[in-house]
From Swiss-Prot:
Disulfide bonds: none annotated. This is Probable beta-eliminating lyase. It comes from Trichomonas vaginalis (strain ATCC PRA-98 / G3). GO terms for molecular function: carbon-carbon lyase activity; lyase activity. Its cofactor is pyridoxal 5'-phosphate. Belongs to the beta-eliminating lyase family.
Amino acid sequence: MELPFAESWKIKMVEPIHKSTREQREQWLKEAHYNVFQLTADKVYIDLLTDSGTGAMSDRQWSALMMGDESYAGASSFLKLKETITKITGFDYILPTHQGRAAENVLFSYLVKQGDIVPGNSHFDTTKGHIESRHATALDCTVDIAKDTQAEYPFKGNVDIKKLEKALEENKDKIPFIIITITNNTAGGQPVSMANLREVRELADKYKKPVLFDSARFAENAYFIKVREEGYANKTIKEICLEMFKYADGMTMSAKKDGLVNIGGFIATRLKEWYEGAKSYCIMYEGYLTYGGMAGRDMSALAAGLEENTEFEMLETRIKQVEYLAKRLDEYGIPYQRPAGGHAIFLDARKILTHVPAEEFPAQTLTVELYLEAGIRGVEIGYILADRDPVTRENRFGGLDLLRLAIPRRVYTDNHMNVVAVALKNVFDRREKITRGVKITWEAEIMRHFTVQLERLQ
């Protein structure tokens, strides 16, 4: 008999979590204006808000933390981090930042100007925010099949080459670069194939445009290439990473995901022009060039985390837990973006809460219902996150409306996933009775989902 799968690590430290009553949760959520971002962590039983900075570090990372060099300039921790990044990506020029959105802010301050158009595959919230706040346009060129949540397609994160070429033909002088998000978070944590990365590079070369990767989950993307794309089964994750980054000119990185740390990020590039152009913004916004807003100890932990998370066993353990939750949802017939993504399950709220109109935000309503059911915090990746059109100020209802359940790395067991699955089943079983959603009572002009205030409709 074949041995069953088991995690590639063992647990060394634990943290207690506590259940609450539905009555308590109703009061807490009302006080939070039905925005789960406004809940304090002690009011959450299983926290699937994000996998960003919420994972558990290894003993090797903790030991690296203690060896951090806190020198203001030229710290050995930075040199080790730089060496590790270059080994994995092939990029020689590195600017550390305190997290991913800071990397975008620094680099986009140099690259993006008013009137620009930045095509890519489903820019995530901060990426789109940094583009639109500079009065530029984030143009989504994701493949159409990504919108069909029930279609089984291995690389739903891909760029639609025809859409991209049309954008390049029509707006050549307005495009500073092409951006590819790996994996494609907004489309459901879906990967981009190596063949697609290669095609984008060829098109970029044809139109003489640089390519930037939003690389928060690059290692998960490499895992999917290994297990799903022909010709890569016998390659190591590190070999696949080097080939992926061969098709880019640079990357921004939130190290809080595939770097396995609680804080940190960086810019890496092969273009000296980008490095020189972004340097002054790094110093102005983040800090000196060899720490960029990160403590030396965090850079040391990040270097160790990047090494760990570009090994197959670590990624296999992580992604199989996501797949486990997906299989439980399949047992109950609950629709989600298929196949399961690398870091999260994305529930298709429009297919679950069929009686809640788009104008009442079904995915946010589902987020509310799941928290009330079991104290589980997910996050809406849908119509609220999409923000209003910067020109017309109308809500954007054209994309998917999803509830994301992002699973922190090395934190929860499959028993926790069973609780999540049954809680969702309970909500799913009463879906016909959920006919009203929520309305916005206050919102910020941009990236409103973090602070929006809502009212529950009866």
